[in-house]
């Protein structure tokens, strides 16, 4: 087997790819070995003796399957998580999610006449200040301070 290092390098330059992607016809190795100029290499490329192999891609098969599983909620447990809690959902996003839920609940209570306007305003401001982490905490506060009107 002849070494075709120089021919491979020149062909790689001409075909604008890496040396590993150069295919040389095993039947015509002697012709390639005798080619010493760039012009000779160009001629062999034209004849199809030297070709450029296609790029090897990265198969998405397993990734697609994993993605489908994740859509179903698999592979999302504590053992699969990397990074902080805030890396998965930002602090601001979490705040928006919480405050929207609280404000919606307060609006509902006001419309149902379970709390009056003054109580609503007081609770709204406290929610804005971050006193309640959840709707449950809001209801606990309402019960402790007897702020819910009985119908």
Curated annotation (Swiss-Prot):
<feature type="region of interest" description="Disordered">
    <location>
        <begin position="56"/>
        <end position="89"/>
    </location>
</feature>
<comment type="similarity">
    <text>Belongs to the eukaryotic ribosomal protein eL19 family.</text>
</comment>
<comment type="function">
    <text>Binds to the 23S rRNA.</text>
</comment>
<dbReference type="Pfam" id="PF01280">
    <property type="entry name" value="Ribosomal_L19e"/>
</dbReference>
<dbReference type="GO" id="GO:0070180">
    <property type="term" value="F:large ribosomal subunit rRNA binding"/>
</dbReference>
<keyword id="KW-0687">Ribonucleoprotein</keyword>
<keyword id="KW-0699">rRNA-binding</keyword>
<dbReference type="InterPro" id="IPR015972">
    <property type="entry name" value="Ribosomal_eL19_dom1"/>
</dbReference>
<dbReference type="InterPro" id="IPR023638">
    <property type="entry name" value="Ribosomal_eL19_CS"/>
</dbReference>
<keyword id="KW-0689">Ribosomal protein</keyword>
<dbReference type="Pfam" id="PF25476">
    <property type="entry name" value="Ribosomal_L19e_C"/>
</dbReference>
<dbReference type="InterPro" id="IPR000196">
    <property type="entry name" value="Ribosomal_eL19_dom"/>
</dbReference>
<dbReference type="InterPro" id="IPR039547">
    <property type="entry name" value="Ribosomal_eL19"/>
</dbReference>
<comment type="subunit">
    <text>Part of the 50S ribosomal subunit.</text>
</comment>
<dbReference type="GO" id="GO:0022625">
    <property type="term" value="C:cytosolic large ribosomal subunit"/>
</dbReference>
<dbReference type="InterPro" id="IPR035970">
    <property type="entry name" value="60S_ribosomal_eL19_sf"/>
</dbReference>
<keyword id="KW-0694">RNA-binding</keyword>
<dbReference type="GO" id="GO:0003735">
    <property type="term" value="F:structural constituent of ribosome"/>
</dbReference>
<dbReference type="GO" id="GO:0006412">
    <property type="term" value="P:translation"/>
</dbReference>
<protein>
    <recommendedName>
        <fullName>Large ribosomal subunit protein eL19</fullName>
    </recommendedName>
</protein>
């Amino acid at each position: 087997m002849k070494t075709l290092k120089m021919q491979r390098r020149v062909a790689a330059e001409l075909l604008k790819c890496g040396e590993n992607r150069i295919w040389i016809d095993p039947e015509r190795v002697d012709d390639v070995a005798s080619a010493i100029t760039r012009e000779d290499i160009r001629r062999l490329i034209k004849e199809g003796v030297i070709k450029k192999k296609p790029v090897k891609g990265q198969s998405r098969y397993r990734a697609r399957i994993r993605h489908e599983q994740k859509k179903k909620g698999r592979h999302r447990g504590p053992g699969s998580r990397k990074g902080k809690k805030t890396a998965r959902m930002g602090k601001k996003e979490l705040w928006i999610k919480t405050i929207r839920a609280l404000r919606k609940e307060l609006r509902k209570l006001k419309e149902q006449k379970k709390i009056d306007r003054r109580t609503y305003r007081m609770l709204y401001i406290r929610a804005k200040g971050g006193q309640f982490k959840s709707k449950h905490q809001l209801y606990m506060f309402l019960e402790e301070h007897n702020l819910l009107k009985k119908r």
